[in-house]
UniProtKB/Swiss-Prot annotation:
The gene is glgB. This is 1,4-alpha-glucan branching enzyme GlgB. Transmembrane segments: none annotated. InterPro entries: A-amylase/branching_C (IPR006048), Branching_enzy (IPR037439), GlgB (IPR006407), GlgB_N (IPR054169), GlgB_N_E_set_prok (IPR044143), Glyco_hydro_13_cat_dom (IPR006047), Glyco_hydro_13_N (IPR004193), Glyco_hydro_b (IPR013780). Its EC number is 2.4.1.18. Catalyzes the formation of the alpha-1,6-glucosidic linkages in glycogen by scission of a 1,4-alpha-linked oligosaccharide from growing alpha-1,4-glucan chains and the subsequent attachment of the oligosaccharide to the alpha-1,6 position. It catalyses: Transfers a segment of a (1->4)-alpha-D-glucan chain to a primary hydroxy group in a similar glucan chain. It is an enzyme of class 2 (transferase). Keywords: Carbohydrate metabolism, Glycogen biosynthesis, Glycogen metabolism, Glycosyltransferase, Transferase. Belongs to the glycosyl hydrolase 13 family. GlgB subfamily.
Amino acid sequence: MTVQLSDEAYAVVEGRHADPFRYLGAHPEDGGTMVRVLLPDAVAVEVIGDNGDVAPLDQAHPAGLFVGPLPGASPRYTLRARFGDTTVELQDPYRFPPILSDFDLYLLGEGTDQRLYDKLGAHPMELEGVAGVGFVVLAPNARRVSVVGDFNFWNPLRHQMRVRGSGYWELFVPGARAGDHYKFDLAGPNGEQLPQKADPLAFAAELRPKTASIVVDATTLPRPRPAPENINALSAPMSIYEVHLGSWRRKEGDQWLTYRELAEQLPAYVRDMGFTHVEFLPVSEHPFDGSWGYQPTGLYAPTSRFGSPEDFCALVDACHAAGIGVILDWVPGHFPDDPHGLGNFDGTALYEHANPMQGRHLDWGTLIYNYGRTEVVNFLTANALFWLERYGIDGLRVDAVASMLYLDYSRPAGGWIPNKFGGRENIEAIDFIRRFNTEVYGKFPHSTTAAEESTAWPQVSRPIEFGGLGFGYKWNMGWMHDTLNYISKDPIHRKYHHGQILFGLHYAFSENFILPLSHDEVVHGKRSILGRMPGDEWQRFANLRAYYAFMFGHPGKKLLFMGSEFGQEREWSHDRSLDWHLLEYPKYSGIQALLRDLNKLYRSLPALHQLDCDPFGFEWLITEDANRNLFAWMRKGNDTRARCLVIVNFSPNVYQDYRVRVPFPGRWREVFNSDSAGYGGTNVGNGGEVRTLEGLVPELSLTIPPLAAIFLTPED
């Protein structure tokens, strides 16, 4: 049978047709039904009608185009194809109805589909009783999109997709299943071949250096049990242990722990240490280990370095079972330009800005999301909701917020484009951030969001209706820089830098602050936290103990990067485990014991956490004793007698009969002393308690230990 091929047929066999359904599949013709099938490498093809009748199809083109009449009246049919010596029966993807409904397309076009991840990507499903996988991807400027994978020998002609409204391409692939590897193969606007792309909404991916996406049936993922309901409340204690999963601990052969091995070890350790939360450095799939996860290519996929999505669920569940909240470091500000990633996705700047003065980050060599596109904003906000809904995550810490807020961030004069008002504020990014926070808190009111924002942008953690950005918390980068600079000075010089400790309290309640001693402070030549401490061996450890106590007595929630809790000497490296062997030595185990006790005290004393973000929870008592490097303040809780006196001595001298006024007469118990011998100190202190002196105003006469902090509370 000679078949005259149309231009449309050539477009299909040459892989440049935007809607192959118009040609392939079953179509009425000359009073009957004609079936057209594209099966590259097939030697012969037969069509089996719904009535069981079999008819051979004629090869109309050597690329694998077969054409012939459909036996019977039913539009349903099966194909029987011979590939070499193998004969298989298979379903024709071009006989099935669309995946996306008109309402789906409406929401996608609006950019308001909060459950975008239920529509886009790869989803195992059943259509007309046939099992397979539905694939959907956004590529509005592509000339042709195919899905390639294990199910079609990675041949882009086999499963060409059809474009629907707003540039969404879709195809149901019968026989594909969970576990299959796949990518999208695209022809650009001018028909040019593009690098094969990973699925932007894939739920799993291959281990680097491979880059294929993996089909996951997300409906079967176990749901982690919830964390305690009010774990993120402003009035609750929040002490966060920041963790890089690949270097917390290693097993034999310097191998990573898996998610399930981490589930057996990490939550128990965090609970024993008294932390309330863990914060994971980004777990989204990323190609480069050295990015620490901050250059993700798969925002919806937990990295395969440590296991499967089910395994990650087990880790979250184990944390929740231990009463530990889970916060993820989330990166919606930029992405890498790896060929398989989001950059130039459909041959155009789809996710990023086309102009490099807007679309490329000069410091990191990454691409910047175009927050002016509704599809991009929908993609990012839905991703935030995805982690909270599918994995039970309790909060998101948003990375590099300052780089999102300012159009001139880290750009030279003349190297940036002002907004429509001539200013440097990124109006679209501000709108995105507010929408993100609105949707997160609207759907998950007990969750939390935190901003790593390093400038003086106002009201980062204030309600949107009052002009804020809507975050729950903001990292206090100013406190971190000032106090680390102060503590790194020799004590004899600290009196000249007294204001660095005082200054932070001028703005301590302008935001809901987290005090961060994060991974960024122990890399790139900055040294470890212990490595910054001046003096001889004893002074270094005493300084560190005093500094940690100062931090836990200071208003604000707490965050400490792994290893700092026991005095890691070396800078952190993502390529090796923490130096756990140091705990064999008392000076390091003493630091660990101090952190454990500080966490316990912070959680148990309402005065230390209830009003962390409220000026009524803090009162300066001594601010002007610069010559002694000494500070004193009162922390307060909601109850009248919920008080904790904090005194910090950043000098190596012991001060006897040091007078401090207090609100209540009677006994005050010394509940914490960083100079305790149990922590490696000299055991100078007040014998566990002290009584107020007789007089009109209650006053304590105290012995202040060297390079140390003491906490005292009134006896009931």
